[in-house]
Amino acid sequence: MSLSDWHLAVKLADQPLTPKSILRLPETELGEYSLGGYSISFLKQLIAGKLQESVPDPELIDLIYCGRKLKDDQTLDFYGIQPGSTVHVLRKSWPEPDQKPEPVDKVAAMREFRVLHTALHSSSSYREAVFKMLSNKESLDQIIVATPGLSSDPIALGVLQDKDLFSVFADPNMLDTLVPAHPALVNAIVLVLHSVAGSAPMPGTDSSSRSMPSSSYRDMPGGFLFEGLSDDEDDFHPNTRSTPSSSTPSSRPASLGYSGAAGPRPITQSELATALALASTPESSSHTPTPGTQGHSSGTSPMSSGVQSGTPITNDLFSQALQHALQASGQPSLQSQWQPQLQQLRDMGIQDDELSLRALQATGGDIQAALELIFAGGAP
């Protein structure tokens, strides 16, 4: 076979419906060597050059052949790759770009810090609600997700996890220091204020905390609102809303400085997760009812039913409800549900269907994540 006939078929693992690409190996690079002399790292470079739009960097892909992940320092001969063989390209998880903290409106932040500082020192129930939220790992993780730049600020993370430090840094007198040095911490503290204000009563109806518009307490970073978290404030009855409040679009906390032309930006998945994680009253019982006890009234939505009963909306409860809903609708077996992904894994040389099913189940059917789990030896 002449050198011009040396070619490989390349297929993206996460795009099973995309036709294979034919990669012809350059004759000038072969010299005295055959196709088998190519290293896997050099093959990655050729593939990145061939599929520039899909594979911009050879360091961000793995190659799969006959169910094996190819090592960069090995050759094609080592893996028995022949002309015409199909090599699957598995794109690694893209590195997340560094998130910059959202800008802070110092005037608005000062007003909100005063509200929080007053509430912390005048209401034991409010103070306990704040510290209960911050001591809950799940809630803290979701606050981190909802606050750009917070995860890369170790000082801010330390403050949120220490009651004494939080009380000190929530002082309005600290704002001049925090805004330039730790803007993400300012945004996180404002987030805590609005989260807890929706689920715990603020001290004193005549205090400065009541002088602010009620809608500002329900606003959350990310454009969603913490409405319906308290039995006292919102019962999902439109007639309890005044005309101005119902006709005026809500805005985000002014301290976060977001001003999109079309109003608040759409809710993202991470923000929705934050809302669900924090949508529980601090004083509510830890008892989680079964989905069968939810929503006895046909005129009441599941969310409002859970809210009015004061029951925390936890991830476990949400998962249980989803599972029961799937079972009620006749959820197909895992094998039939993920048959396309199973066949794709078989095409890549992974013949252990049981292993593949476990990996797919653990990753929710994500073929790329399942492959990474299988090759990492982490399939359950």
Curated annotation (Swiss-Prot):
Q: Which residues carry this modification: Phosphoserine?
A: S230
Top-level lineage group: Eukaryota
Which controlled-vocabulary keywords does the entry list?
Antiviral defense, Immunity, Innate immunity, Phosphoprotein, Ubl conjugation pathway
As for PTM, the annotation reads: Deubiquitinated by OTUD4 which stabilizes UBL7 expression.
Q: Locations of Polar residues compositional bias?
A: 294-313
**Tissue specificity:** Ubiquitous. Highly expressed in heart, skeletal muscle, testis, thyroid and adrenal gland.
Q: Which part of the chain is the UBA domain?
A: 333-377
Chain ranges of the Ubiquitin-like domain = 18-98
InterPro entries per record:
UBA, UBA-like_sf, Ubiquilin, Ubiquitin-like_dom, Ubiquitin-like_domsf, UBL7_UBA, UBL7_Ubl
Its GO CC terms are: cytoplasm; cytosol
Q: Where is the composition biased (Low complexity)?
A: 206-221, 240-253, 270-293
According to the record, what induces this protein's expression? Answer: By type I interferon. Down-regulated by phorbol myristate acetate (PMA) in bone marrow stroma cells.
Does the entry feature the keyword Ion transport, yes or no?
Answer: no
Q: Which cysteines are joined by disulfide bonds?
A: none
**Gene3D superfamilies, per this entry?**
DNA helicase RuvA subunit, C-terminal domain, Phosphatidylinositol 3-kinase Catalytic Subunit, Chain A, domain 1
> What's the subunit arrangement here?
Binds ubiquitin. Interacts with MAVS; this interaction enhances TRIM21-dependent 'Lys-27'-linked polyubiquitination of MAVS.
According to its UniProt entry, the function of this protein is described as:
Interferon-stimulated protein that positively regulates RNA virus-triggered innate immune signaling. Mechanistically, promotes 'Lys-27'-linked polyubiquitination of MAVS through TRIM21 leading to enhanced the IFN signaling pathway.
UniProt-recorded name of the protein: Ubiquitin-like protein 7
What is the originating organism of this protein? Homo sapiens (Human)
User: What is the primary gene name for this protein?
Assistant: UBL7
